[in-house]
């Protein structure tokens, strides 16, 4: 997944896709006090001689060049940069852009652009061409010879590296003409397509970074780098639960920073990875293969990699696991207070007590939320006759209960350039490309000929004056997944003036007002579980509390490297979902499960090292013995009454199915906790290292995530098979009236029985009343 792009793009809406927004600014951290001098060891010379930190003069540069022998090459396709569809350029002067960035610790020495294009055979060669602009500067002009028209052709262009900065925008501008006479600016023969498999290749020289904590999160993470983050964690081979909790806090912080890029945290021990690495150590738990200085408290330090000066090591240390957790929390919440090569945290204020559903990345569900909180002013404005989409990214709690509701109320305020006359211009509204509704873009009100003439005159005098409009409508909640994008397309009809009179004017503007709101406050939180879609897309139910204070991760008794890597990467995924480090998380093993029985549980391991798989086999929709996999099946025929209300998936399992597979696989499944009603367990099980990696890749692949749903998913490489198995249950609460309606909707026989009883009572009462009245008439009393 990639961030929103194509600002000012002239491609039609089919060329745009739903993309999540970059992460919001980090939450305001609690006060972190760094001891004077910011050193780990009072004897700084000792630390320096042991290769952990080295004192750098304050006037030393933050970056310095590494010898040219360290040159590296890498490339991105346009798809990797966010163009999930080909770029389609239409008209005489359309333009489409793609942003890209260069990490701060690299200098670009060469750039090669490889374009896969196709263009109209009707173009006049001498007048038509494709311009490549980097940050507004002309970088190249590509001719469009007639003999190559009408078919895909590869064009390679070298770009001057001096045009490249940290944050860049590459615009591709099509200049097209089909006649030497008067031409229609939007003639159907004016087209050029650019494949999203086109690529841009960089040759870079790495730069050595100064040992300074003030540069964090660089060089371990650079927001300019659009690649997936891969950051090794170096731990003792038998890391304690407390050390793993500290490591989880740090990985969730980096996961939140990585956002749409995704993050993978391979755990290692024994040999220090030849890469930027995070090292965790206490006085009792010191990883072999790296020198750790004496530790005087919760500490952070950054130093050169002992085996390769191109890389850095970040040391997170404490005398015990409590201090280690303090250091990890301070790193994730108070990094702006650090400077120099090392620091000791002398005080960390109490952390804010979190409330359910208060994740920074999630839309507030207790009040209307303004669009200005979700998108910048620039993102809400467009220009031109074929403007880009206005995109507003939404992250909703996945447990919103919208049964029988009108939908999510949306108050939309927008503005647009007045139309010179009534036409077919419209505002089309989609969610994740799914059509919702449309509204006409009207001209000024016209009551008579005089008013019409005056309106035309005002339009000519004030071409930039925008017409305000307000609409209130509902978004169908069943079409709004946890990760969604509102897409507003201003479709302006180009006015035709006649032969040789059409002139393309760039005076059309439109904007969505920042005061527009989306309101979730009317929806209770209530959801049927298990629901792996909620877990895969939003980390639910664990992310209900953004700090994971009601979550425990149960790792194997003897966890392997794959288990720890999976745990760390999952915590990165949780941080990406909420935007907050998981500083409330608990890590335990099978023997600790009773102590954390009142929490939601994330279960990791395999059939050989996770005893809870056999202990809880009767509660799970999945059990394993060797290569035999057993699944509980629900009776799907009886899940609903087709003539009444909506489907309900709360039937008991009626059968079991056994299957034998020798292929590599991983199983992701959920069930209600055997320890406490209403609590959930999500298990990720695989007997092979590659199986755990497949699960993580699936969770970070937008195409595969959409295939994860139900209560069980089997993942084999790039294949995902999901099914609904076992018992279902509900978490959350409903208002009394809605709860009664929901209960009765699942028991139509009870409604029939109540109607019969009511009819019998009413019949009895009426019989008694009429009998008494008849007796009075007979007796004359």
What are these regions (language model features)?
Residues 1-8:
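Sec-dependent N-terminal signal peptides of Gram-negative exported proteins
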Residues 9-781:
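Solvent-exposed alpha-helical segments and adjacent loops
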């Amino acid at each position: 997944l990639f961030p929103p792009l194509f600002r000012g793009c002239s491609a039609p809406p089919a060329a745009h896709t739903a993309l999540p927004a970059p992460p919001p600014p980090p939450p305001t951290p609690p006060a972190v006090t760094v001891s004077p001098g910011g050193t780990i060891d009072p004897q700084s010379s000792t630390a320096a001689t042991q290769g952990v930190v080295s004192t750098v003069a304050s006037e030393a540069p933050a970056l310095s060049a590494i010898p040219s022998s360290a040159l590296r090459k890498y490339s991105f396709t346009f798809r990797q940069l966010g163009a999930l569809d080909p770029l389609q350029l239409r008209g005489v002067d359309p333009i489409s852009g793609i942003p890209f960035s260069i990490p701060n610790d690299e200098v670009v020495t060469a750039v090669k652009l490889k374009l896969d294009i196709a263009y109209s055979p009707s173009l006049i060669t001498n007048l038509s061409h494709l311009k490549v602009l980097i940050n507004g500067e002309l970088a190249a002009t590509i001719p469009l010879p007639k003999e190559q028209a009408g078919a895909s052709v590869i064009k390679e262009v070298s770009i001057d590296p001096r045009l490249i900065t940290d944050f860049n925008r590459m615009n591709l501008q099509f200049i097209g003409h089909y006649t030497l006479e008067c031409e229609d600016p939007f003639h159907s023969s004016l087209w050029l397509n650019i494949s999203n498999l086109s690529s841009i290749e960089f040759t870079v020289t790495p730069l050595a970074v100064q040992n300074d904590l003030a540069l964090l999160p660089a060089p371990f993470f650079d927001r300019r780098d659009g690649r997936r983050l891969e950051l090794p964690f170096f731990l003792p081979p038998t890391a304690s639960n407390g050390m793993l909790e500290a490591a989880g806090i740090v990985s969730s912080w980096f996961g939140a920073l990585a956002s749409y890029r995704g993050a993978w945290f391979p755990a290692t021990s024994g040999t220090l990875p030849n890469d930027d690495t995070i090292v965790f150590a206490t006085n009792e738990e010191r990883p072999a293969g790296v020198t750790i200085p004496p530790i005087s408290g919760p500490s952070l330090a950054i130093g050169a990699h002992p085996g390769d000066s191109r890389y850095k090591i970040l040391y997170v240390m404490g005398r015990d696991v409590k201090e280690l957790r303090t250091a990890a929390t301070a790193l994730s919440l108070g990094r702006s207070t650090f400077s120099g090569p090392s620091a000791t945290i002398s005080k960390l204020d109490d952390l804010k007590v979190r409330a359910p559903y208060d994740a920074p990345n999630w839309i507030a569900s207790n009040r209307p939320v303004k669009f200005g909180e979700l998108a910048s002013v620039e993102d809400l404005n467009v220009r031109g006759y074929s403007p880009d989409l206005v995109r507003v990214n939404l992250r909703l709690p996945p447990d919103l209960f919208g049964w029988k509701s009108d939908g999510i109320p949306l108050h939309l305020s927008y503005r647009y350039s007045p139309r010179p006359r009534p036409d077919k211009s419209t505002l089309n509204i989609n969610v994740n490309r799914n059509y919702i509704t449309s509204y006409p873009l009207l001209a000024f009100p016209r009551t008579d000929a005089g008013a019409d003439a005056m309106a035309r005159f005002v339009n000519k005098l004030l071409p930039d004056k925008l017409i305000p409009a307000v609409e209130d409508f509902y978004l169908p909640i069943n079409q709004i997944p946890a990760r969604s994008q509102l897409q507003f397309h201003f479709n302006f009809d180009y006015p035709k003036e006649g032969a040789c009179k059409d002139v393309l004017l760039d005076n059309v503007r439109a904007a969505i007002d920042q005061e527009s709101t989306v309101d979730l406050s009317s929806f209770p939180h209530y959801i049927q579980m298990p629901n792996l879609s909620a877990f895969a897309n939003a980390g639910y139910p664990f992310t209900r509390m953004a700090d994971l204070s009601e979550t425990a991760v149960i790792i194997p008794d003897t966890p392997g490297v794959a288990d720890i890597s999976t745990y760390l990467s999952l915590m990165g995924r949780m941080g990406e979902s909420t935007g907050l480090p998981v500083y409330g998380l608990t890590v335990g093993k099978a023997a600790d499960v009773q102590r954390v029985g009142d929490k939601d549980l994330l279960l990791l391991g395999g059939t050989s090292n996770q005893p809870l798989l056999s202990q809880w086999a009767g509660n799970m929709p999945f059990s394993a013995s060797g290569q035999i996999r057993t699944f509980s099946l629900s009776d799907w025929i009886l899940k609903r009454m087709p003539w009444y209300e909506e489907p309900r998936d709360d039937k008991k399992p009626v059968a079991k199915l056994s299957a034998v597979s020798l292929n590599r696989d991983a199983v992701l499944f959920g069930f209600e906790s055997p320890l406490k009603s209403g609590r959930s367990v999500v298990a990720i099980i695989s007997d092979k290292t590659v199986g755990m990696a497949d699960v993580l890749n699936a969770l970070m692949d937008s195409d595969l995530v959409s295939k994860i749903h139900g209560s069980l998913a089997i993942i084999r490489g790039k294949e995902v098979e999901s099914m609904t198995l076992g018992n279902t249950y509900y978490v959350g609460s409903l208002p009394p009236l809605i709860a009664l309606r929901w209960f009765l909707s699942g028991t139509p026989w009870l409604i029939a029985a109540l109607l019969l009883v009511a009819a019998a009572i009413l019949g009895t009462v009426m019989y008694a009343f009429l009998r008494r009245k008849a007796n009075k008439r007979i007796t004359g009393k």
